[in-house]
Amino acid sequence: MCIRDSSITEEAIEDNLYDRLASRYTKALARSMAQTKQIKAASILNNAFSTSNPVGDGAALCSSAHPSLSGNQRNLLTTAADLNETSLEQMLIDIASFTDERGLKVAVRGTKLIIPKELQFIAERVLNSNLRPGTADNDANAMKSMGMIPEGAVVNHFLTDTDAFFIKTDAPNGFKMFNRSPIKLSLIHI
């Protein structure tokens, strides 16, 4: 992570403006650090479909060909689709069909829908309307009544694809974030 350094002029120090300027610069650096962390974290999802950024098995994060001992496994829809009732239901069905490397079913389920800001209103209708969204049917909204996505939808403002959406599951070893080396701050007195 690279954060441009800031400096305070000798005149500012001589005129006793150091405290006020240092406080402003410190806040700007803190914002910059927080922004950089968010951008880096979102880059995993922003590049999820790119084979230029493979994960441990050599495939894109979202792929129809994750190699395993039991054959290729997929974690994306067979046919790409926009966020709607049908595509979300199919993703939840696919998640319930996940198997491990030996072909045994694993008990995972979707817990949270991760979306860009452009999909927040569609997600609200799909997840939280009492009746099926976008139809004249009076059927109950099955995803809502069954509690299929208990943590609801969360908007990630750093996602760059306006129609990509992701489901976080309750798999025990999902995404992890850690600071390999913490930010180092130093003050040089002249």
Predicted regions and their residues:
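Short, structured patches in soluble enzyme cores that scaffold and shape functional sites
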Residues: E10, M33, I115-K117
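Residue-level detector of short, conserved catalytic/binding motifs and their immediate flanks
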Residues: R4, K27, T111
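Short acidic, glycine/tyrosine-flanked loop/strand segments centered on an H-E-D-like triad
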Residues: R4-D15
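Sequence/fold signature of self-assembling virion shell proteins
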Residues: A60-D100, A107-K112, K117-I188
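Alpha-helical scaffold segments that mediate packing/assembly in large oligomeric complexes
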Residues: I13-R24, R31-S97
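Conserved small/polar residues in nucleotide/adenosyl-binding loops
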Residues: M1-D5, I188-I190
